[in-house]
Amino acid sequence: MAEPITLARPYAKAAFEAARDASALQSWSDALVEAAAITRDSKVKALLSSPSLTAVQKAAAFIDLCGDTLNEAQKNFIRVLADNNRLPLFPQVSQLFELYKANQEKAVDVELQTAYDIDDAVLAKLATSLTEKLDRKVSLQTAIDPSLLGGAIIRAGDTVIDGSVRGRLAKLAETMSH
């Protein structure tokens, strides 16, 4: 069977295109995040996996759980997912939607791990450099990890730059063992 993220991709893309065309990216984002949270509930999981309910009943129940926050297009999206037995994929749909949204908005979340606390001026300079290099608006989150010994690890999407002392020592050890 295919991975859930793979199954969710066409639905996330369809939701993104509908949201973009309606200039409603944030509304859709909020709705998908809420739907993903609802889907994670154990009682909802049981409801969605119940063979005694039809797709129409599952969609209606799910829409009721979402409350009055959904517009008609979002309700129709839920109905399509229910018709295709894909309601449990909402967490993956939401995750992919956020990636498409960030790409549209030319934004990227960057995680910076360092061994020590970094000065704000250095962080600002790094954010500026990353913005230029990635051609995206950078949202920088920092974390301190003393096990790095020194240097830093930068994660931006699927790009990882390991400039840590720990990483360099690991490379050296690998080179010496061959």
Swiss-Prot record:
Gene Ontology CC entries for this record: plasma membrane; proton-transporting ATP synthase complex
Gene3D superfamilies in alphabetical order: N-terminal domain of the delta subunit of the F1F0-ATP synthase (1.10.520.20)
Keyword field contains Repressor: no
InterPro entries: ATP_synth_OSCP/delta_N_sf, ATPase_OSCP/d_CS, ATPase_OSCP/dsu
Major place of residence: membrane
Record's bilayer topology term: Peripheral membrane protein
Subcellular location: Cell inner membrane
Keywords recorded for this protein, A-Z: ATP synthesis, Cell inner membrane, Cell membrane, CF(1), Hydrogen ion transport, Ion transport, Membrane, Transport
Record GO terms (molecular function): proton-transporting ATP synthase activity, rotational mechanism
Pfam families for the chain: OSCP
Acyltransferase keyword on record: no
Record's subunit section: F-type ATPases have 2 components, F(1) - the catalytic core - and F(0) - the membrane proton channel. F(1) has five subunits: alpha(3), beta(3), gamma(1), delta(1), epsilon(1). F(0) has three main subunits: a(1), b(2) and c(10-14). The alpha and beta chains form an alternating ring which encloses part of the gamma chain. F(1) is attached to F(0) by a central stalk formed by the gamma and epsilon chains, while a peripheral stalk is formed by the delta and b chains.
Function noted in UniProt: F(1)F(0) ATP synthase produces ATP from ADP in the presence of a proton or sodium gradient. F-type ATPases consist of two structural domains, F(1) containing the extramembraneous catalytic core and F(0) containing the membrane proton channel, linked together by a central stalk and a peripheral stalk. During catalysis, ATP synthesis in the catalytic domain of F(1) is coupled via a rotary mechanism of the central stalk subunits to proton translocation.
Cross-referenced HAMAP family: ATP_synth_delta_bact
Family under the similarity heading: Belongs to the ATPase delta chain family.
Protein name: ATP synthase subunit delta
Organism: Teredinibacter turnerae (strain ATCC 39867 / T7901)
